[in-house]
Design a protein with these regions (language model features):
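Cys/His-rich Zn2+-coordinating "finger/knuckle" modules used by eukaryotic regulatory proteins
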Residues: 235
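Domain-scale signature associated with acetyltransferase and cell-envelope carbohydrate enzymes
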Residues: 1-213, 219-221, 230, 243-248, ...
């Protein structure tokens, strides 16, 4: 009879509806979606969520997690902690990312990245491997990151490309380092090199969350590698091409003079400075790794999935180090040995790169005892940092500065000419 449908005897539904439901429940990850819903995860439109078979549902919290329509979740190392929300603005894809508590990724793509408690990114995010966003670090819409480390509270505007950089500074969500909209960190040279990682602030002071914020004005950029002190203010529309070593400086760089001459490839006129800045960056990575292993560990490991998140952060730091060493190795391969110093670098390439492994040093015992007691009492990490007195802050900075200095020393042992750069 026209307009009628056969009824499925088992479900008492029209057969075409029953068949469509069957196809939907055959979607990849359907069983995982069902398991997540059963344990309390909010998934408003389950049939639109794609979860690969290697995702472990036991690493996704049941408390306050929301996965909006169209999201894709991939990777055996993926962790989603309580209160985290995916895809509130547009679909979000995450692959092997570790999310702390109350993370909001509103739309885009993230892979092999770590987001600590309260970190957030707006729609259009493109966060690639080696990125570590610490507590409440955030970006608005259409932000591209790779091998980027943002300290707590750092805020990025919209339409930003900020790869191969570490940004520290600031004390709170109302007193934070900021990158203005339409900012670019230029990290690729005409010679095809990426020995361009820039350090805004530093680790030995930055971890204490008591330094003036850094402001990089919108519609501007930085030509890596550059380094700045805390409290640096770079005006909107400016392109930073030189270091700002002193703290608290207002910078409005002049436009470079016009040039029209033949290109000289692989000249590396500032080779020693480029090498030194990369070594300093590696030294700060070493200092941050020591901080995570000896201090952060005390607070992370007590949390749900904290061990996995700590491992992810250490993976990011290892990835950042490997990237910097790889890029240095490729640059040295192109250096012409036309001076004694360059000949020494070329001849000692392997020894130099081997000297760039992680530097370390023991934390002050009294500081570790204080942090351990705070963690045992349930004090949050950010609150514990605020309790340090002046002596303890001095000792933390001295400890981490010594690690940076050790990185300098071991590198200069293989290339003595570099010692003058530090």
């Amino acid at each position: 009879m026209s307009g009628t449908h056969r009824v499925d005897a088992d479900t008492l539904e029209p057969a075409h509806i029953s068949a469509r439901k069957g196809r939907l429940m055959d979607n990849r990850g359907a069983a995982t979606v069902e398991a997540l819903i059963a344990k309390g995860v909010e998934i408003p439109n389950p049939s639109t969520v794609d979860i690969t078979d290697d995702v472990n549902p036991d690493l996704i919290s049941a408390e306050g997690v929301v996965i909006h329509p169209g999201c894709r979740i991939r990777g055996s190392r993926t962790v989603i902690s309580s209160g985290s929300i995916l895809g509130a603005e547009t679909p979000m894809t995450i692959e092997n990312c570790r999310l702390g508590r109350d993370v909001e990724l509103k739309g885009g793509f993230a892979q092999d990245a770590v987001f600590l408690d309260g970190a957030s990114m707006g729609s259009g995010a493109h966060v690639r491997s080696g990125c570590l966003l610490e507590e409440q670090a955030n970006g608005a819409h259409t932000v591209g990151l790779k091998q980027t480390i943002l300290f707590p509270f750092v805020t990025l505007g919209s339409l930003i490309n900020f790869c191969d950089a570490m940004l520290t500074g600031g004390t709170s969500r109302s007193d934070h380092s900021e990158v203005g909209s339409s900012y670019i960190h230029f990290n690729f040279t005409p010679d095809g090199d990426k020995t361009t990682a820039s350090l805004f602030g530093d680790v030995p002071r930055g971890v204490l969350l008591d330094q003036p914020p850094i402001f990089l004005g919108g519609q501007g950029g930085a030509v890596g590698p550059v380094m700045t002190g805390f409290g640096t203010v770079v005006g909107a529309g400016a392109v930073l091409r030189a270091d700002v070593p002193d703290d608290g400086m207002l910078v409005l760089p002049e436009a470079p003079a016009g040039v029209n001459r033949p290109v000289e490839t692989a000249s590396y006129r500032k080779l020693a400075a480029v090498l030194a800045k990369n070594i300093t960056y590696l030294g700060n990575l070493s200092a941050l790794e020591s901080w995570y292993r000896q201090v952060r560990r005390l607070f992370l490991t007590r949390l749900e999935y904290g061990d996995a998140i700590l491992a992810g952060a250490l993976d990011c730091l290892a990835s950042a180090r490997a990237e910097r060493i790889k890029r240095l190795g490729r640059l040295i391969e192109k250096v012409r040995p036309d001076t004694p110093e360059r000949q020494e670098l070329v001849d000692n390439r392997a020894e130099f790169l081997a000297a760039l492994t992680v530097a370390d040093g023991p934390a002050p015992a009294h500081v570790i005892r204080k942090f351990g007691a705070a963690s045992g009492d349930g004090v949050e990490y950010l609150d514990a940092i605020a309790t340090l007195n002046d002596e303890e802050r001095h000792d933390v900075t001295a400890w981490l500065s010594a690690i940076v200095a050790e990185q300098h020393r071991t590198a200069a042992q293989t290339i003595p000419a570099l010692s003058a750069q530090f």
